[in-house]
């Protein structure tokens, strides 16, 4: 991964969706012009924005096959990562405890992937990379 940089690696998926919509909106035309990009028309397009998110590890795989909708997942991740809430605390506020435990387990099991990924531009208090580390051999 020589020279890689994960520019949007610290953004939640729902934020990326909103950012893509904004980039193609009229309100972004002036910014696009200042960056030397076409200041009119579609840059990202509905075909890309409408494609279901996927890790693309196997044919026809979609994130929704194994993860909740991002309107549910992103607030849960924010609570776990940025607000340091435990699955037990989240269950006291109406979150399904089994879902919170499952997501926390997925985070732990995917730590090795984050160590292999390119550096992330830090945008939040607890970005993956510099602000978030778990032991690679963590169980749970």
Per-range role (PLM):
Residues 1-140:
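ATP/NTP-dependent adenylation/nucleotidyl-transfer catalytic domains that generate, transfer
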